[in-house]
Structure formats: structure tokens, C-alpha cells
């Protein structure tokens, strides 16, 4: 199981629209490659159809190859739909990958099983597959009910906790804070992994 974070990296609303379009495209590619995608967290932009960032999980035999094809800088070439007279046509987003050793923190996590709620059909409503996991040392807690089995939810919970711990460590590091402020600049100067064109988000 892999986590991918899509980020506009403090870019303008056009970059946030690019995040939304990239996420939609990624989900379609995952479906074609039999990779299960779960959208875990999103931060909306100024407009309803935009995303400042999105955190997703990928699971399946082709998950690594799919993530490899997306990680890095993504370029979107399109006139601004929000500022018609704006001269800029190149917009960028960044996609980062996170994996963790599933056994590394298993002893430091307390699990509670819960009855799943919300959409998911009869199977979800009749099983206690949802999991709340708490990292004892930090107090970080996550609830996962997106997978169909308790085992899969525990795997995703461990990965989410590991990701949140890394984010916490980054926030506590002055040097890494500085690196994150430079992220947008680095994205724009980097060679794009993939390039898409127009509102239809066509690759080429």
C-alpha cells in the first residue's frame, strides 16, 4: 500500500485546478490497472472544483508502477480559466510518494474495531471492519473504514499514522520548514514527469 500526496505547493488557483484534474486522471488510470484508490484527505481551493492538496492511497499489484508514473512535477499548459487576460499558461503541481515498514510500529499502536458507517452498501453496514488506531507515544489517532476488511483497514491505518508522524517531524524541523517553503520554486524549475494540455487535460 502506497500513499500519494498531490499538492499545488502554494501555487495560484490554476494550480489547484490542475491538482483536481490530475487526481481525476490518476483515478481513471488506477481503475484501468486494477489499483484500488482511496481519497483520504483533501484541502479545497478557492473554487469548488479545485484542490490545494489531496492525500490518496493506492493498493494492488500495479500500485508501485502507477505511482512511479506520477511522482514528481506535473505540468499543465492551459490559459487561465479564472483570469482570461492573464498571460501565463504554464501551471505546476507536485506529487510525492510515501511508504512505510508495516511492522515497524505495530507494537506501538492500539486498535479499536468499530461498526462502519456511511456509504458503502450492505456489506459495510453489517460488519465491524472499521478501525480506530492510536499511536501511543504521540497520541496521533486515525479512523479508517474505506477498505472492506479489518485487516486492510489496519494496514492503511498504520501507513496513515506513519505518514502523520513524518509530517509532524517535518513541522518540528526548522530546516525542513525552509525546504517546504522552497517546494513551489523547485517544482516550477524541475523537469516535469508528465505534461497535460487544455481544459480536457490531454497528455502530450
From Swiss-Prot:
Database matches in PROSITE patterns: RF_PROK_I
Keywords: Protein biosynthesis, RNA repair, RNA-binding, rRNA-binding
Region (rRNA-recognition domain, N-terminus): 2-98
Molecular function GO terms recorded: rRNA binding; translation release factor activity
Alphabetical list of InterPro entries matching this protein: Pep_chain_release_fac_I, Pep_chain_release_fac_I_sf, PrfH, Prokaryotic/Mito_RF
One Pfam match: RF-1
Top-level taxonomic group: Bacteria
UniProt short sequence motif GGQ motif, positions renumbered to this chain: 120-122
Chain segments carrying region Linker 1: 99-107
PANTHER family: LD18447P, PEPTIDE CHAIN RELEASE FACTOR HOMOLOG-RELATED
Quaternary structure note: Found in the A site of damaged 70S ribosomes, but not in undamaged ribosomes. Contacts (damaged) 16S rRNA, 23S rRNA and ribosomal protein uS12, but not mRNA.
Protein name: Peptide chain release factor homolog
Organism: Escherichia coli (strain ATCC 25922 / DSM 1103 / LMG 8223 / NCIMB 12210 / NCTC 12241 / WDCM 00013 / Seattle 1946)
Lineage of producing organism: Bacteria, Pseudomonadati, Pseudomonadota, Gammaproteobacteria, Enterobacterales
Gene: prfH
Amino acid at each position: 500500500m502506497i500513499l500519494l500526496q498531490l499538492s499545488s505547493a502554494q501555487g495560484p488557483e490554476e494550480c489547484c485546478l490542475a491538482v483536481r484534474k490530475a487526481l481525476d486522471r490518476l483515478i481513471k488510470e488506477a481503475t484501468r490497472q486494477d489499483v484500488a484508490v482511496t481519497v483520504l484527505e483533501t484541502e479545497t481551493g478557492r473554487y469548488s472544483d479545485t484542490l490545494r492538496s489531496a492525500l490518496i492511497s493506492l493498493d494492488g499489484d500495479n500500485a508501485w508502477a502507477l505511482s512511479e508514473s506520477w511522482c514528481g512535477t506535473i505540468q499543465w499548459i492551459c490559459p487561465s480559466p479564472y483570469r482570461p487576460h492573464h498571460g501565463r499558461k504554464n501551471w505546476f503541481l507536485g506529487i510525492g510518494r510515501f511508504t512505510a515498514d508495516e511492522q515497524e510500529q505495530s507494537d506501538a499502536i492500539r486498535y479499536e474495531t468499530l461498526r462502519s458507517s456511511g456509504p458503502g452498501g450492505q456489506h459495510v453496514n453489517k460488519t465491524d471492519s472499521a478501525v480506530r488506531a492510536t499511536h501511543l507515544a504521540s497520541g496521533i489517532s486515525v479512523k479508517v473504514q474505506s477498505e472492506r476488511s479489518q485487516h486492510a483497514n489496519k494496514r492503511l491505518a498504520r501507513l496513515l499514522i506513519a505518514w502523520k508522524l513524518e509530517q509532524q517531524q517535518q513541522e518540528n524541523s526548522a530546516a525542513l520548514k525552509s525546504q517546504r517553503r522552497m517546494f513551489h520554486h523547485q517544482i516550477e524549475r524541475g523537469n516535469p514527469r508528465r505534461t497535460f494540455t487544455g481544459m480536457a487535460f490531454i497528455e502530450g
